[in-house]
């Protein structure tokens, strides 16, 4: 409708149309009707093209998430099954696996001449190369670390690039909704992969063994990434304008600014809280309840199912109420979840909860903590709100990812010491306490407005 009104206004301002309207009103009306219809069809065609681009985007990146469920998500089991690593070696292997999260920002900056879709294709290729070597060539221990770094670099570059492409594809005022829709579909892909991995290992279709040169699950990951790469290539071919990288030619290096500090702080807090999701939430099940990986896998499937419904609602909330209220919601919700987890853990360790009761509280705490990860969409929208131009968004998203990883790695030992010497429940109390930062940023946004 907007485009038709714009065309009518343009026609009325032209000398020819005013002449026809005065001298020959009926032909002028016919001409107006024809041009309006033609313009309407053009707008409809453009909208259909954009909708097709969204579908290709969703297929490509959901497939990539699905592939990651067969590869990077179970890499710890690969280390143990194939290389029989001890706890010290496992800790050191976090360096090649997490270092790409820190250096990814510099790689993206160095490839400033590449468009977002080209960067995503490079990322998919890096991931595929890593899965190919690890899954088919049975590398030695040192070479294995190199290709763990390779696949992980691809995985980490994808994160900010994916969000930047999603924001380009979203309609005005619907960015949160589209991000939530993508995250919901991606979570369903992760859930399907988790279920298939569980079945595959339970019935012998998949394995991690030192005496076998082939890793079947990694081979599946390789094939799925190749399919995702195909759909991404089609997206770049059909919508080449989407591959134009937004950056300021006059500025070199990272567009870091003082006004973006609230985003960096919120992202750092997210990195701190991510340790709860990746390390200490599983420890509730594994260490406190002495349950195995199959229990964690089933709980992961339940968490993915819940996330697939929650993530789209978070996106819609952001579009309707804005980033400020989104940060308040994040602060209150995650704070409540961590306090609930602390209460449950205290009950388990003190012996107040036993049997089925302790399992119910532990399982629900684990699921809630996993679902809370989807509030990361609030941080993406915060960066978009603060940015001076679209050129700043992706580079700062990648820098925020680096801040997230640096803090996540540095606090792991501290939180482990708190768990062991102070008490497991205090780890989650700290996670709840830092939620005040989100509330503080929300207050700052209100004053700034």
Q: Where do the model's predicted regions map?
A:
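Juxtamembrane intracellular "pre-TM" segments in multi-pass secondary transporters
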Residues: 41-51, 235-271
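Short amphipathic helix-loop junctions that connect adjacent transmembrane helices
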Residues: 74-88, 279-296
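Helix-to-loop junctions at the C-terminal end of transmembrane segments
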Residues: 104-116, 201, 310-323, 419
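Multi-pass alpha-helical transporter architecture, strongest
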Residues: 108-110, 135, 224-237, 341-345, ...
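Cytoplasmic membrane-interface "Motif A"-like loop-to-helix N-cap segments
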Residues: 112-124, 320-334
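C-terminal ends and interior cores of transmembrane alpha-helices
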Residues: 125-139, 333-354
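Intracellular juxtamembrane helix-capping segments at the cytosolic ends
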Residues: 157-170, 373-388
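Glycine-rich segments within core transmembrane alpha-helices of 12-TM secondary carriers
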Residues: 180-197, 401-411
């Amino acid at each position: 409708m907007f485009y038709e009104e714009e065309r009518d206004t343009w026609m009325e301002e032209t000398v020819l149309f005013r002449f026809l309207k005065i001298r020959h009103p009926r032909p002028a009306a016919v001409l107006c009707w024809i041009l309006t219809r033609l313009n309407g069809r053009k707008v409809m065609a453009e909208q259909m093209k954009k909708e097709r681009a969204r579908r290709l985007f969703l297929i490509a990146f959901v497939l990539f998430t699905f592939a990651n469920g067969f590869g990077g998500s179970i890499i710890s089991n690969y280390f143990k099954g194939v290389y029989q690593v001890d706890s010290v070696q496992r800790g050191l292997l976090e360096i090649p696996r997490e270092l790409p999260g820190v250096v990814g920002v510099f790689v993206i900056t160095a490839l400033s001449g590449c468009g977002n879709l080209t960067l995503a294709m490079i990322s998919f290729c890096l991931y595929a190369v890593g899965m190919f070597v690890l899954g088919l060539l049975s590398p030695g221990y040192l070479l294995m670390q190199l290709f763990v770094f390779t696949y992980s670099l691809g995985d980490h570059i994808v994160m900010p690039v994916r969000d930047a492409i999603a924001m380009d594809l979203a309609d005005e005022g619907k960015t949160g909704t589209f991000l939530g829709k993508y995250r919901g579909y991606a979570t369903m892909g992760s859930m399907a992969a988790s279920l298939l991995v569980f079945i595959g290992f339970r019935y012998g279709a998949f394995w991690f063994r030192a005496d076998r040169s082939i890793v079947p699950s990694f081979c599946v990951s390789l094939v799925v990434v190749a399919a995702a790469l195909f759909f991404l290539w089609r997206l770049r071919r059909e919508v080449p304008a989407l591959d134009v990288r937004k950056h300021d030619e006059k500025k070199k290096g990272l567009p870091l600014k003082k006004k973006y500090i609230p985003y960096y702080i919120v992202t750092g807090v997210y990195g701190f809280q991510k340790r709860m999701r990746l390390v200490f939430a599983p420890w509730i099940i594994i260490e406190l309840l002495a349950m195995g990986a199959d229990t964690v896998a089933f709980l992961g499937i339940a968490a993915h199912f819940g996330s697939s419904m929650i993530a789209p609602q978070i996106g819609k909330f952001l579009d309707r109420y804005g980033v400020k209220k989104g940060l308040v919601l994040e602060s209150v919700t995650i704070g409540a979840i961590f306090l609930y987890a602390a209460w449950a853990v205290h009950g388990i360790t003190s012996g107040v909860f036993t049997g089925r009761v302790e399992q119910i509280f532990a399982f629900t705490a684990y699921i809630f903590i996993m679902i809370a990860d989807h509030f990361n969409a609030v941080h993406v929208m915060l960066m978009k709100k603060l940015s001076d131009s679209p050129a700043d968004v992706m580079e700062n998203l990648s820098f925020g990812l680096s801040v997230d990883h640096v803090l996540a790695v540095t606090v792991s030992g501290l939180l482990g010491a708190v768990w062991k010497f102070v008490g497991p429940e205090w780890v989650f109390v700290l996670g709840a306490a830092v939620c005040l930062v989100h509330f503080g940023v929300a207050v700052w946004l209100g004053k700034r407005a």
